[in-house]
Curated annotation (Swiss-Prot):
Keywords noted in UniProt: DNA damage, DNA repair, Host nucleus, Hydrolase
Protein source organism: Bovine herpesvirus 1.1 (strain Cooper) (BoHV-1)
Protein name: Uracil-DNA glycosylase
Pfam family, one: UDG
Family annotation (HAMAP family): UDG
């Protein structure tokens, strides 16, 4: 894809003069865990965490051993409210979700260290839009979770056979407390209704 090559060239240029996150080997980590036909849920984020050691290519996820960020703590709280009795995870690595068919995709795949939103014009958005469009056309039925105005603006449209869920961003600064978000239970009900099986939202 020409826009992917453009984004990679711009990434290479910037990485020579600034620290870029996540590490290059993890930029496309979101492609490693499930085949397109096995994707059940898409959670769309904005850009990677901008502190060193956090981002590893999955939206909202951090490496093991890194403190769980406030946004992810709020996501975990919502999961527990959706499924009473669910254990609270002890870390913030969401690879288990990714292996179970949850695509954790940011609209920008890289960021300059310490500068949120700094790579929003790099060109990743066109790649992400193409990925979402192809999934919408060829996979599913799918559940799209769009948290916050940025994700909702970036998403575009999906076919009628998919379920699109919107809510405020899980950031503690958001107006609506994310703990009241029922997307996880809604997603499972939709997936089970369409014969795809719900997602196990536990993290081990």
């Amino acid at each position: 894809m020409p826009y992917t090559r453009h984004a990679l060239r711009e990434y290479e240029r910037r990485s020579r003069v600034e620290q870029v996150l996540p590490p290059k080997a993890d930029i496309f980590a979101w492609t490693r865990y499930a085949a397109p036909e096995d994707i059940k849920v898409v959670i769309l984020g904005q850009d990677p965490y901008h502190s060193r050691g956090q981002a590893h290519g999955l939206a909202f996820s951090v490496n093991r051993g890194v403190p769980v960020p406030p946004s992810l703590q709020n996501i975990y709280a919502a999961v527990q409210k959706n499924f009473p009795g669910a254990p609270r995870p002890s870390h913030g690595c969401l690879e288990d979700w990714a292996r179970r068919g949850v695509l954790l995709l940011n609209t920008s795949l890289t960021v300059r260290s310490g500068a949120p939103g700094s790579h929003s014009s790099l060109g990743w958005g066109r790649l992400v839009h193409a990925v979402l469009a192809r999934l919408s056309a060829e996979s599913g039925p799918l559940v799209f979770m769009l948290w916050g105005a940025h994700a909702q603006r970036a998403f575009g449209a999906a076919g009628k056979r998919h379920l699109v869920l919107t809510y405020s961003h899980p950031s503690p600064l958001s107006r609506a407390p994310f703990v009241h978000c029922t997307h996880f239970a809604e997603a499972n009900a939709f997936l089970e209704q369409h014969g795809r099986g719900g997602v196990d939202w536990s993290i081990v």
